Amino acid sequence: ESARIGFVFVRRGVVPEALSTWTVPRLVGMARAGELLMTGRILNAREALEFGLVSRVVPDAELLPAARALAAEIAREAAPVSVAITKWMLWGMQMESDLAHADDVDARAFWWTGTQPDAREGVRAFLEKRPPRWSMRPSTDMPDFLRDPRLLGSRGEARKKR
């Protein structure tokens, strides 16, 4: 609630760094990114929420409990491998300019996860109205195709060889 966020680089005589010019437009759109990055204005928590830089605002005293509750919900309800692949896709798709290729990656990941034990467990748990018991782990059960550097965001010759 008392957080403040700003990309103040231009107010210090330098350009935005840490991939701000790449990340911020993807989060808030080009018009808002331009406003934020070219003015260097500092936003309060409510403004950051309105701009889409944060997903929610909580009172300062509730920040750690809210973060833990979100982490617990993900850990309790979501299949770990599915979460890991989703995170990989969220970041990877941001670099992908070819919509048809992105759709292929999406379909491949959906098909693969749908054939795994956690998919069967997720459906079973839902039908039986009980918490899921996930058996797969990101440390040991990730699909091999995620290691292919040509999969998302690659450019040039490596991409053409698909």
Predicted feature locations:
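C-terminal long alpha-helix characteristic of the crotonase
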Residues: 1-3, 54-101, 117, 133-157
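Crotonase-fold acyl-CoA enzyme core
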Residues: 1-81, 116, 120, 130
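An acidic, glycine-rich surface segment that forms the CoA-thioester-binding/catalytic face
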Residues: 11, 18-22, 27, 104, ...
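Helix-loop "lid/cap" segments that line or gate small-molecule binding pockets
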Residues: 36-37, 89-93, 108-114
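Short, flexible turn/loop "capping" segments at secondary-structure junctions
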Residues: 46, 102-104
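Catalytic Tyr-x(3-8)-Lys segment
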Residues: 52-53, 106-110
